[in-house]
């Protein structure tokens, strides 16, 4: 049965699609853009109040377009858009505060964030807390904070925001606290199950040490093995929702290493 909150969300989304919406100077970040028709771009934005918004930037590919210099990843923007249907028309576009420059591996990490947001967010669903997390993550990537730690924190927050939080506190069967000295089998969207021994032929990718789960829960790890386990776990958890199509950002990162 659909919850009252879910029904309200669906109704709001339907209204945004049906109504001739006009939104002025909404804080946003560009997630992705594609050529559209002869001179335009089809752009996906992550906005503060409306979540993911897809809009046509008319004439954006023309050399003298007012949009050309501003439609860049990691540049805080203020966007205006209007129109009916899923795809809106981009109006005024202004810079927000200073751009967040990312370089090298941190640039590819930022592109990875944009790609998974594009894959997982539905149009016109508000995610204010996630928007703030995204912005904070970009700032953290710009600084000296350990990159893997920054990414794992965002991935955990993203899954929680979408209703797929990973319970790193307890075994999903017995509800006993995770034991640092035990091994657990992970099932996406279900949780961790204590195992007495690893069966012959069982995929090790789903097996995790309790100490590694506790390290991820605390978002701190001293051992390289804990860092690798955290990455493996989040990749498993996200894969269920991202689908089978490979991520372009991962391919780009691999090709430039």
What positions do the PLM features span?
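Methionine residue identity
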Residues: 1-2
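Non-catalytic alpha-helical scaffolds and adjoining flexible linkers that form interface surfaces
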Residues: 12-41, 46-257
